[in-house]
């Protein structure tokens, strides 16, 4: 009876260890093979076009609860790059509180991204009608993060809790927006967390192997 219990404990430990080792190995592989030189995992370039004044993401509620005195910026960093396909026009990319951005685009015609399909790649946009022209985005003070100018433009943002949305516009706030954008995310805790899982998996595997050995 004791050997049976030891065998069951050993088998359970081996299964748990396998999960920990696979999880840790996967995180380390992603951190090594899928990140660029700055540690970001990037999307493919995405082309977006509208005849309206802006293209926005839907509002996203971000909630981060970190135990202990850990800087939120170490959890994840968002990086968005964009370039106007008209080489003579500057691009504006901005991240702001959803309420602030909604107020800025009130009564302004813009398109909102409502769905992204990976295979085959497809972006679904919904048009919000309006009759007003927006004020120049670079003159606004509510942006959490932004970048603008001719050629490729990039901003990075250490993720914080709140309700946010992203907007893509022409720098001069004119209608007819056509841009190419890339989104990247960096998760610094991925490597140490993956390493911790591997260590824990190794310890549990030793325990499981010992139990199985005692049961034989």
What residues fall within each predicted segment?
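C-terminal edge strands of extracellular/lumenal beta-sandwich accessory domains
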Residues: 173-196, 203
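Hydrophobic secretory-pathway targeting helix
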Residues: 1-35
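Juxtamembrane interface at the cytosolic side of transmembrane helices
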Residues: 1-8, 190-216
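Glycine-centered flexibility sites
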Residues: 10-13, 17, 24, 162, ...
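Extracytoplasmic/periplasmic regions of membrane proteins
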Residues: 33-184
């Amino acid at each position: 009876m004791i050997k049976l219990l030891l065998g069951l404990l050993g088998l359970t430990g081996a299964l748990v260890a396998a999960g920990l080792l696979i999880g840790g190995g996967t995180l380390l592989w992603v951190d090594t093979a899928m990140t660029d030189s700055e540690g970001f995992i990037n999307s493919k370039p995405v082309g977006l076009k509208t005849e309206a004044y802006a293209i926005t993401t839907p509002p996203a509620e971000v909630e981060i609860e970190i135990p202990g005195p850990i800087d939120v910026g170490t959890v994840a960093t968002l990086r968005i790059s964009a370039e106007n396909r008209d080489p003579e026009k500057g691009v504006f990319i901005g991240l702001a509180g959803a309420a602030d951005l909604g107020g800025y685009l009130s009564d302004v015609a813009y398109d909102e991204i409502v769905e992204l399909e990976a295979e085959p790649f497809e972006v679904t946009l919904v048009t919000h009608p309006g009759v007003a022209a927006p004020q120049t985005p670079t003159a606004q003070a509510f942006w959490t993060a932004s970048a603008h100018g001719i050629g490729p433009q990039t901003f990075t943002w250490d993720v914080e809790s709140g309700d946010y949305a992203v907007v893509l516009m022409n720098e001069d706030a004119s209608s007819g927006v056509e841009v190419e954008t890339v989104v990247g995310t960096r998760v610094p805790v991925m490597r140490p967390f993956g390493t911790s899982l591997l260590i824990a998996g190794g310890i549990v595997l030793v325990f499981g192997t010992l139990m199985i050995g005692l049961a034989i």
